[in-house]
A protein has these predicted regions:
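Short, surface-exposed alpha-helical segments at coil->helix boundaries
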Residues: 45-60
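Small/aliphatic-rich secondary-structure junction motif
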Residues: 1-42, 46
Length: 132
C-alpha cells in the first residue's frame, strides 16, 4: 500500500484494512521520500524522509488498530519507481493507493502518481478515492 508523504489518509488506511481483513492478507505500507538524486536536492535525504516516515507509520498504526497485520517501510527515491520496485521485490498481490486530491489543472501540471502507478505497474493497482 502506498502512503503519500506529508499527507493524512485515514480513508485509505481503512480501505486497505478492510480489504486485507477480508482476504487475510498482511499489509506493507510504503512511503517514498521523493528524492531522485540526493546530490541535486536542496534538502538532506533525512529531512525529506521524515514526512514519508510519518505517513507510513500513521497508516500502519491505523491498519493494526483494525486488527490487521501491517508493517511500514520508508523508501528512498522517486515515489512511483520506489513503490513499483518494492512491489516487485516483495511479490505484492495488489498495490493500493489513494486517488488524487488535486484539482484537474494541478494534476495536469504536476502529474498524478496513481495514474503513473496504473500505467507502469505489472501488478493490479487499486485506487481508493477520498470521501466527498
Amino acid at each position: 500500500m502506498a502512503a503519500k508523504a506529508g499527507s493524512d489518509q485515514p480513508w485509505l488506511a481503512d480501505a486497505a484494512a478492510e480489504l486485507a481483513g477480508q482476504s487475510g492478507a498482511v499489509v506493507d505500507v510504503v512511503s517514498a521520500d521523493g528524492v531522485d538524486l540526493e546530490a541535486f536536492s536542496t534538502v538532506p535525504r533525512s529531512e525529506a524522509a521524515e514526512p514519508a516516515e510519518r505517513a507510513a507509520t500513521a497508516i500502519a498504526e491505523r491498519i493494526r488498530a483494525a486488527g490487521v497485520k501491517a508493517t511500514e517501510h520508508t523508501l528512498s527515491g522517486p515515489v512511483v519507481r520506489s513503490v513499483l520496485l518494492f512491489a516487485e521485490e516483495h511479490d505484492a498481490d495488489v498495490i493500493v493507493c489513494g486517488g488524487s486530491t488535486r484539482g484537474a489543472v494541478a494534476r495536469r501540471l504536476l502529474g498524478d502518481q496513481s495514474i503513473q502507478l496504473i500505467r507502469r505497474s505489472r501488478r493490479p493497482v487499486l485506487v481508493v478515492t477520498p470521501p466527498r
